[in-house]
Regions:
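Short, mixed-charge low-complexity intrinsically disordered segments
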Residues: 40-87
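Short aromatic-glycine-(Arg/Gly/Cys) micro-motifs in beta-strand/loop hairpins
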Residues: 2-20
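Generic detector of N-terminal low-structure segments
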Residues: 11, 21-23, 69, 76
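Structured catalytic/translocation cores of nucleotide/phosphate-coupled proteins
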Residues: 18, 36, 41-42
Length: 87
């Protein structure tokens, strides 16, 4: 029996004060985890330069209390306008 490969993906977006973070995955949870990994890498880099900001830059476990994550779902080979499928 053959199984069909996933024909879609999800993009998780989080807009902070200075940057738009994105993560992509086959579903919302994997997209969210990819986004949080990007945030963790960003935070680690910042704290290497500014260790005194540890308390003011939230970690990935608490970032969602500060910024909302939005999800965009896409189908492969489809065309979109402003997040809405047109073809």
């Amino acid at each position: 029996m053959e199984t069909e490969a996933s024909t879609g993906f999800v993009v998780a977006e989080m807009n902070t004060h200075h940057f738009m973070f994105r993560g992509a995955g086959l579903n919302r949870e994997t997209a969210r985890l990819a986004l949080l990994n990007a945030w963790r890498a960003h935070r680690t880099t910042l704290l290497a330069r500014y260790p005194e900001r540890t308390d003011s830059i939230p970690d990935e476990g608490s970032i969602e209390a500060h910024f909302k994550i939005h999800y965009l779902e896409f189908a492969a080979d489809a065309g979109y306008r402003d997040g809405e499928r047109v073809v």
